[in-house]
Amino acid sequence: MFEDPATRPRTLHELCEVLEESVHEIRLQCVQCKKELQRREVYKFLFTDLRIVYRDNNPYGVCIMCLRFLSKISEYRHYQYSLYGKTLEERVKKPLSEITIRCIICQTPLCPEEKERHVNANKRFHNIMGRWTGRCSECWRPRPVTQV
């Protein structure tokens, strides 16, 4: 389908433009399990701002289950260290608003309010493979407290 790597669309929006289809019509398969993405998974892929990957010149996305699984595997294999928000700003020499931070579970880019929530709750951001992660509001849940 897309033989020249230089002209391949990288985002779902670009792919839709090239194929002259809307986001509501486009069909993608998961790069891992090869199942067709459900409509809500296509929308989530778009919202998450992930990149299209190619196998045998065909475009692929990733389903929600595989994305969560791959995120967990990446966390286990490639975790480097964690920092509090203030320390992260000092280390990177940028304010949190300019640092790209994705959710450690669903890979959604964190909005400024979600980053601020980490700071206010005194939670750390994690460096995994050189990329910063935290938790989005959808995946945020407090750790269970054990009672003695």
Curated annotation (Swiss-Prot):
GO terms for molecular function: DNA binding; PDZ domain binding; zinc ion binding. Its main location: host cell. A zinc finger (unnamed) spans 30-66, 103-139. Gene3D superfamilies: E6 early regulatory protein (3.30.240.40). It is found in: Host cytoplasm; Host nucleus. InterPro entries: E6, E6_sf. GO terms for biological process: DNA-templated transcription; regulation of DNA-templated transcription; symbiont-mediated perturbation of host apoptosis; symbiont-mediated perturbation of host ubiquitin-like protein modification; symbiont-mediated suppression of host cytoplasmic pattern recognition receptor signaling pathway via inhibition of IRF3 activity; symbiont-mediated suppression of host type I interferon-mediated signaling pathway. Belongs to the high risk human alphapapillomavirus family. The cancer-causing human papillomavirus E6 protein has a unique carboxy terminal PDZ domain containing substrate. Belongs to the papillomaviridae E6 protein family. HAMAP family: HPV_E6. Plays a major role in the induction and maintenance of cellular transformation. Acts mainly as an oncoprotein by stimulating the destruction of many host cell key regulatory proteins. E6 associates with host UBE3A/E6-AP ubiquitin-protein ligase, and inactivates tumor suppressors TP53 and TP73 by targeting them to the 26S proteasome for degradation. In turn, DNA damage and chromosomal instabilities increase and lead to cell proliferation and cancer development. This is Protein E6. It comes from Human papillomavirus 52. The gene is E6.
